[in-house]
Amino acid sequence: MINEIYENSNSRMKKSIDFFKKNISKIRTNRVSPSLIENIYINCYGTSVPLSKLSNILSEKSNILKINVFDNNIIKKIEQAILSSDLGVNPQIQENYIRIEFPKLTEARRFELIKLINKEAEQNIISIRNIRRDANEKIKKLIKAKTIGKDEDKKFQEVIQNLTNSRIEDTKKILKLKEKEIKKI
């Protein structure tokens, strides 16, 4: 029973960190990444489809993305979806592909991005702590039901605290790497 609680907590904390990584990977640094636009949805073929399923997205230069569209009939729809996104860029249609040139980051924008990723990191840390709290509450219920003793409770709390500290440290490492990436000129 205790092992199940531990494994569940560990799994949830890993998912939380993966979600955090995914969220901050979408935040632009000096080098643009296809992940910035791959989840823009385009209304075509009677449904809403992510751009990554309709095209091949390449990083042409540090600030230019090239979108090789599979079906030229939807190239205008893709352009409209990019224009209506909050990226603030102008896509340029050229033959069978779209080029997007992103402006260089200003110092003020870098500062805003660092604040944003710090906020994301703090939310992730709160999520990890909530998972720890849930695990501790489950253990307290087991104590009340007299399924486990107080000694096991203390050991488990120590183990879950070490896991929590480790996952928070992982979050902080990911944060520092992303900050370094944003600050890099």
UniProtKB/Swiss-Prot annotation:
GO cellular component: cytosol
Location relative to the cell: Cytoplasm
Coiled-coil zones: none
InterPro entries, A to Z: Ribosome_recyc_fac (IPR002661), Ribosome_recyc_fac_dom (IPR023584), RRF_sf (IPR036191)
UniProt keyword annotation of Kinase present: no
Keywords assigned by UniProt, alphabetized: Cytoplasm, Protein biosynthesis
Family, as annotated: Belongs to the RRF family.
Domain of life, source organism: Bacteria
Main subcellular location: cytoplasm
Full protein name: Ribosome-recycling factor
Listed Pfam families: RRF
